[in-house]
C-alpha cells in the first residue's frame, strides 16, 4: 500500500511539473471555455504552475474548462523524450477570479503566469453555435429585404385587396351569387391564406432583426395592420352578415394602406442605394483629387530640381542633353484632370 501511495504521489508530482501536462484549479466555476496563453508565448516559454522560478518551453495555447483548468500541450514530435521530473511541491496553485457583470467579456487581472484571458459568453455556452445563428439571421435579413421578396409581397397584397373587394361586392349584392355557391367561402379562404403568409413574414422579420423592427414605427404599424386583418378574417367566420359587411370595409382600407406602404418602402430602399452609390463616387473623386494634388507637387519639385541641375551644367560648360518639352507634361496633367472630373 505504501508503495502504491508513493507511486501515486510521484505520478501526481510528475504531472504538476511535466512540461506536457499542467493542472490549475479555480475556486469559482466559470460560464464558458476560456483560452489562456502564456505570458512568454511570443518567445516560446511557459512557466510551470507549481513554480515561478523555472520556465518550461511550450508552443501550445492553454485551455481553461468550467470547473478546472486542464492544460494539455503536445510536442510537434510525438517521439520526443520527456525530461526527468524534478522534486517540487505538489500543492496545487489556487487562482481566485471574480466574474464581472457589466460586460459579456471576462477581464483577467493578476493571473501571474498568464498574459491574457479571452472568451465570449454565449447563451448556451457554445460560441460556434451563436456565430452560426448570427450568420443565419444575417442571411434571413438579406433575403427578406431583397427585391424579389418585395415584389412577391406587393403581388400578394394587391391580390388580397382584390379578394376583399370581391367579398365586399358579393355582400353588397353588386355581384349576385346563387344561394349555395361556394364562391364567397373560396375568396375568404384565399384571403385568409395570404394573411397567414403575411403573419409568417412578420415573424421572420422579428427573428432576423428584432431591434430594427422595434425601432421603426412603420414596421410595427404594418405588423399591427396584418394582425388586425388576420383577426378580423377569423372573426368573419363566426359573425352575421351585417357585422361582416362593416368588417370587410375595414379590411379594404387596411389592405390598401399596406399596398402604399410597401411601394413606399421599395422607393425608399432604391433611393437609399442610389444615395450610397453617389456617396461612394464622391469619396473616390475626393481621393483622386488628392492624388492629383500630390502628383502636382511632385511634378513641381521635379521641375525645380531639373532647373537647378541645368544651372549647374551651364556653370560647368556642359552641354544640356535634349529633354522632353515641359508642355508635354502639362498636356498629360490636363488630360488626367479632365478624366477625373468626368
UniProtKB/Swiss-Prot annotation:
Pfam families: Ion_trans (PF00520). The chain crosses the membrane at residues 149-169, 186-208, 218-238, 248-268. GO terms for cellular component: monoatomic ion channel complex; plasma membrane. SUPFAM superfamilies: Voltage-gated potassium channels. It is a multi-pass membrane protein. Residues 1-20, 74-102 are annotated as: Disordered. One of its GO terms (biological process) is proton transmembrane transport. Residues 86-102 have a biased composition (Polar residues). Less sensitive to zinc ions as compared to the mammalian homologs. Residues 1-148, 209-217, 269-342 are cytoplasmic. The keyword Membrane applies. Residues 271-315 form a coiled coil. Belongs to the hydrogen channel family. Homodimer. Mediates the voltage-dependent proton permeability of excitable membranes. Forms a proton-selective channel through which protons may pass in accordance with their electrochemical gradient. The segment S4 is probably the voltage-sensor and is characterized by a series of positively charged amino acids at every third position. Unlike other voltage-gated ion channels it lacks the pore domain. The C-terminal coiled coil region mediates homodimerization. This is Voltage-gated hydrogen channel 1. It comes from Ciona intestinalis. The lineage of its organism: Eukaryota, Metazoa, Chordata, Tunicata, Ascidiacea.
Amino acid at each position: 500500500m505504501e508503495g502504491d501511495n508513493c507511486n501515486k504521489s510521484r505520478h501526481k508530482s510528475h504531472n504538476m511539473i511535466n512540461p506536457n501536462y499542467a493542472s490549475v484549479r479555480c475556486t469559482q466555476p466559470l460560464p464558458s471555455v476560456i483560452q489562456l496563453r502564456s505570458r512568454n508565448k511570443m518567445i516560446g516559454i511557459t512557466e510551470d504552475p507549481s513554480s515561478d522560478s523555472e520556465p518550461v518551453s511550450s508552443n501550445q495555447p492553454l485551455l481553461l474548462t468550467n470547473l478546472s483548468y486542464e492544460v494539455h500541450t503536445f510536442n510537434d514530435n510525438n517521439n520526443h523524450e520527456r525530461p526527468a521530473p524534478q522534486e517540487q511541491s505538489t500543492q496545487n496553485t489556487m487562482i481566485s477570479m471574480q466574474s464581472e457583470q457589466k460586460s459579456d467579456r471576462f477581464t483577467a487581472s493578476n493571473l501571474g503566469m498568464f498574459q491574457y484571458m479571452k472568451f465570449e459568453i454565449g447563451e448556451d455556452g457554445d460560441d460556434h453555435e451563436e456565430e452560426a445563428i448570427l450568420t443565419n439571421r444575417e442571411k434571413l435579413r438579406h433575403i427578406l429585404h431583397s427585391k424579389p421578396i418585395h415584389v412577391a409581397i406587393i403581388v400578394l397584397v394587391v391580390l388580397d385587396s382584390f379578394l376583399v373587394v370581391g367579398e365586399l361586392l358579393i355582400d353588397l349584392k353588386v355581384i349576385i351569387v346563387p344561394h349555395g355557391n361556394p364562391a364567397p367561402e373560396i375568396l375568404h379562404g384565399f384571403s385568409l391564406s395570404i394573411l397567414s403568409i403575411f403573419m409568417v413574414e412578420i415573424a421572420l422579420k422579428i427573428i432576423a432583426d428584432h431591434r430594427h423592427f422595434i425601432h421603426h414605427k412603420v414596421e410595427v404599424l404594418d405588423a399591427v395592420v396584418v394582425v388586425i386583418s388576420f383577426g378580423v378574417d377569423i372573426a368573419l367566420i363566426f359573425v352575421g352578415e351585417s357585422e361582416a359587411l362593416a368588417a370587410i370595409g375595414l379590411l379594404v382600407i387596411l389592405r390598401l394602406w399596406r399596398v402604399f406602404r410597401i411601394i413606399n418602402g421599395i422607393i425608399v430602399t432604391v433611393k437609399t442605394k442610389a444615395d450610397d452609390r453617389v456617396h461612394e463616387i464622391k469619396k473616390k473623386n475626393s481621393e483622386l483629387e488628392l492624388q492629383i494634388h500630390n502628383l502636382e507637387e511632385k511634378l513641381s519639385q521635379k521641375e525645380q530640381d531639373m532647373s537647378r541641375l541645368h544651372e549647374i551644367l551651364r556653370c560647368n560648360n556642359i552641354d544640356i542633353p535634349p529633354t522632353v518639352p515641359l508642355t508635354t507634361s502639362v498636356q498629360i496633367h490636363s488630360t488626367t484632370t479632365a478624366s477625373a472630373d468626368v
